[in-house]
Amino acid sequence: VLMSLVALYGCSPDDDTATGSPLITGPLAALQGTWKYHCYAESGKHAEIIYKISGTHISTSKVYYQHSSCTDESYKEEGAYSDLSLGDNITSGKFSEYQITYTVGSYGRTPLDNATTNSFAGECGISDWTENSYTNLLDNDDCGFPKNTTFLNVYKVIGNNLYLGDPIDAASRTAFPTEAKSNFI
């Protein structure tokens, strides 16, 4: 079983009066901002995640690297999610944990070098990957999920760290995780 905690470092929420976006208050305010998790090992690869949360919208970018130095980009997965909403408070310790839901609007992959582009041939049922070109994976039975799928997750914020039950793009569609994990595996 893949256990995941995304311990991401971010900035604190602020009033986005420059863009006219409303200020989010309450528990969702703690999620606002940009969260980064730098150069971690995932399934034999190394990656960097960036989550940008603004209002009820989430954008994700996960760049995979060829080496542990995280300098040679291999490919990138990007997603956009909306309708972020707060569910139940499931606090069992001293830090508040909340259930959240969000809906996928776009999701895809971009190979970033020739070797990766060639290695993707046939992956996800797609034979014509193009280097530096985004490929939509929504409604792809092999590598994606249906558009407007709602994901179920949990989160807590401790200091400047965001903890999730599962990564944004890998959360369950059928049941909430029982807790925001303390390890990222």
Question: Whereabouts are the PLM-identified features?
Answer:
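Contiguous, well-ordered beta-strand patches that form the walls/edges
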Residues: 38-46, 63-160, 165-180
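Sec-dependent signal peptide recognition
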Residues: 1-2
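Short, solvent-exposed coil/turn segments at beta-strand boundaries
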Residues: 30-32, 50-59, 154-163
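Short, intrinsically disordered, charge-biased short linear motifs at domain edges
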Residues: 21-22, 56-58, 111-112
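Bacterial Sec-dependent N-terminal signal peptides
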Residues: 6-30
